[in-house]
């Protein structure tokens, strides 16, 4: 597995739900992090029996000059877009899916890839009723952009998967809804070992891994997100899984260590081959 940086985004205090700025400052300062948070955006590349697999595809041109770096880093890893066989989406928010298409032509950037996503996730973003019920910003940035990115793959290059389904050899969808209705993590099994790519289980690990009850202002169902985060963190810790996170600081690999009533991420040692 290779970590690929899509860059980072600067966020404000308002990304947190019911969490005060001074609390953010205090928790970020413990790890010598800037506050308000700077959030890494990562994607992950797998090469193995299932072919060349990309997990999430970054933000394209949607998030400004500090993000959208996936393609130059994919090239640095020696992979051309047309060589990618499968793209696994954790969910359809812009920083995870807006690298699917060419921003000028609207065509697929991964000409030979099949996109695999949770059925619930795709059905939500293609629900006209849900779109009409959303505010104007969400209609554009979430529903509109999700459809813009996924549409070119609906001609036979989109596969809808279910919770618990082994979508490729050794890769299983583990649903962890709340952040979005079909937010998914990907459980990887190889040679008797497991690791999990946890998507947006934690946007700011310094806070949400230590305090799993803290949700984000843009969570679809904040309470569900907090419950599922709490449960999945406990499972990861109990099973001592290596984790890969889209918003763990690059390269994004780590282990959970118990700290008080929560956890912290112990960053995996740097390794050119993981």
PLM region spans:
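Metallo-beta-lactamase
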Residues: 1-79, 83-97, 109-175, 192-200, ...
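Active-site metal-binding loops of divalent metal-dependent hydrolases
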Residues: 6-8, 57-60, 92, 120-121, ...
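Short acidic/His/Gly/Ser-rich catalytic and metal-binding motifs that mark active-site loops
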Residues: 63, 124-127, 205-209
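Cap/insert and terminal regions of metallo-dependent hydrolase folds
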Residues: 68, 187, 191-274
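Metal-dependent catalytic neighborhoods of phosphoester/phosphodiester hydrolases
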Residues: 69-72, 98-106, 255-256
